[in-house]
Each structure stands twice: as structure tokens, then as C-alpha cells.
Amino acid sequence: MKVLTWNILAAEWVKKSYYPGVDTSVIFDNKARFARIGKILKQIDADIIMLQEVMPQEYLNLVLLFGDKYFISELKTMVWGYNKNSESGNVTFLKRSLFPKNTISHYPREYGVYTRCLYKNKPCDIFNVHLDDQSPQKRYKQWDDLHAISRKKDCNNIIAGDFNQEYKKKCKLYNTPGFETHNMCPTYYIERKMNIDNILTKGFQKAPLSKCNWYPTRIEDGFKEYGSDHLPVIVEVDIHE
């Protein structure tokens, strides 16, 4: 089962001051950015897709592009402390050929989308998260909440998304007992190299680490290649038969 998570960069967060020296025709061309993102998603053809920073119009376009192949959650708009009127949010896709529709339930949470489903007749909890970007204490509180509501017994777990916390082996977010952290590669290329997006799993067979994507050294090249300031993270996992 191929799992992908990606912060695709909402247009509402794109400002010239955030990307100094970059041609504005590149960063503000939302149509071209979305076309590039859609092409990458089709090429990867993941079984589970978890996106962050999806704008309402992009959500409608994604449903048109992928609705025949995936069950798609509603858009969970995120509310940030410094912007109560944000429009973008998280969306989770489950491939129709692998997940029975009548077993899928989506629950909006402050930090994203919580999904319950069956995969190969076994229960699976999937968290598509975009953790707080201002307060480590709030991130840990959100982390504690998702673990409090997840099913513990005989349930496989996937936690993926934008953690807004740089990867460190001993960090609580990446060092949860029983969970395997799959990404060791940089996922954000503005200002400096950072690994802040990841996929964690529990209950699955041990899987190889996520392969590193091409990392841009120029912001403009990154926008042209990915359409976002984040890189996608992909891992392949399977359950114990």
C-alpha cells in the first residue's frame, strides 16, 4: 500500500516577501502550480493521499480529477491563531479498489482529518495532520489528542502530514512507542533545509525508509518542479497477514 502526504501550499499563504528574488509570475501562477501538483499525484498513484493547504476551488478540482478513483473526505478547513478566516485545509483520499466504502468514516479535528476504515479486513486509523506552527506546547497537545482517540487494540495506525516540527530522533512527535518513522529527508526548502513532513505507522510490516525526492537549491526551481514549497513524502507499507 503506497501512502503519500504533501503540503501543496495554499494560495492564501503565498506572498512575495516569503519568497525573495523569485519571479512573481512563477509563485502567483496558481493554475500552473495546481497542474504540476495534479500531474505528480497521478504519476505517484498512491493508495492513500493526505494533502494539507488545499483551497476550496482546488478541492473541487481534485474531486473532478480523482473522484472516480478515490473516496475523498470533505475539506477540513484549518483555523490558525493568527488567521481565523483561513480557507485552506486537509483532505484525505482512499483508493476505491482497496477500501470498502461502508467502512470509511471521516472525523474533523482541530489539527486535520481522522479517518477510520478497513484495509484487508483489518481496522485502520489514519490521521492527516497539520500541527500548529507557532507553539510546541500546542503541537504536543494535538499529538496527545490524536493518540487519545485512536483505537488501540488490533488496529493499524498511520499518522502523516505537516508536523511543523523539525525531525529529531528523540523528539516526542517522532519517538512515539510502537510507531515507525519513515522519512529522514528534507521536505521544505525555504530559508534552509528542514524535514518537517513525515509518515509514521504502527502495526504494519517493517518498511524501508521513504526515498528522498530531488531537493531544489533555488526557490524558483522548486516551484517549477513541485508547485509547492514542500516536497511530497511517500512510503510503501503492508499489514501482517
Segments (PLM) and residue ranges:
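Surface-exposed cleft-lining segments at the edges of enzyme active sites
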Residues: 21-27, 129-139
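Active-site metal-binding loops of divalent metal-dependent hydrolases
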Residues: 8, 54, 129-131, 162-163, ...
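Metal-dependent phosphoester-hydrolase catalytic domains
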Residues: 116-118, 137, 141, 148-158, ...
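Soluble or luminal CAZymes and related metallo-dependent hydrolases
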Residues: 28-37, 54, 85, 106-109, ...
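N-terminal, active-site-proximal structural segment of metallo-dependent hydrolase catalytic domains
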Residues: 1-65, 239-241
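Structured beta-strand-rich core segments of catalytic domains in phosphoester-bond hydrolases
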Residues: 48-127, 131, 210-216
